[in-house]
A protein has these predicted regions:
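Short catalytic-loop micro-motif centered on adjacent basic/acidic residues
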Residues: 13, 103-104
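N-terminal helical cap/lid subdomain that shapes the substrate entry/recognition surface
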Residues: 2-90, 94-98, 111, 123
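Substrate-recognition "cap/lid" segment bordering the active-site pocket of phosphatases
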Residues: 103, 109-126
């Protein structure tokens, strides 16, 4: 019998990967960078993403990373309600009803996980 299910957040509960890729490119283009196509950095960690975007200038990479995280991202938040997998809540509620424990495993920041949980209305089944 299944006792617990772990759900990944990005790409499973909420389709954020495409949004993150596009948001990063929009930021970089505002800074004068050009992309022939949007790089798919899905599943990469933050240091690897920024090294891929700015491979040759460590100081510029760090300045852009900080500005993106502290200014650009808060000004361009993830629209979780629009990107939420519509099966998230019903599946978790059904599992909970059957006595299966549910949890979210994610490398996302805790405040983002909490925001998703609130928007999805699933705090009571985790």
């Amino acid at each position: 019998m299944i006792k617990a299910v772990l759900f990944d957040m990005d790409g499973v509960l909420v389709d954020t990967e495409w949004f993150y890729n596009r948001r990063r490119v929009a930021f970089m283009e505002e800074k004068g960078f050009h992309f022939d196509e949007i790089p798919d950095l899905s599943g990469s960690n933050e240091p690897a993403i920024w090294e891929a975007l700015v491979p040759d200038d460590i100081e510029l990479r760090e300045r852009l990373r900080v500005e993106y995280k502290q200014v650009y991202s808060p000004d361009h938040p993830v629209p979780y309600a629009e990107l939420l997998n519509n099966q998230t809540e019903p599946v978790m509620r059904e599992l909970h009803k059957r006595g299966v424990k549910c949890a979210i495993a994610s490398s996302s920041y805790r405040e983002l996980i909490d925001e998703l949980v609130d928007i999805a209305g699933i705090a009571d089944v985790l």
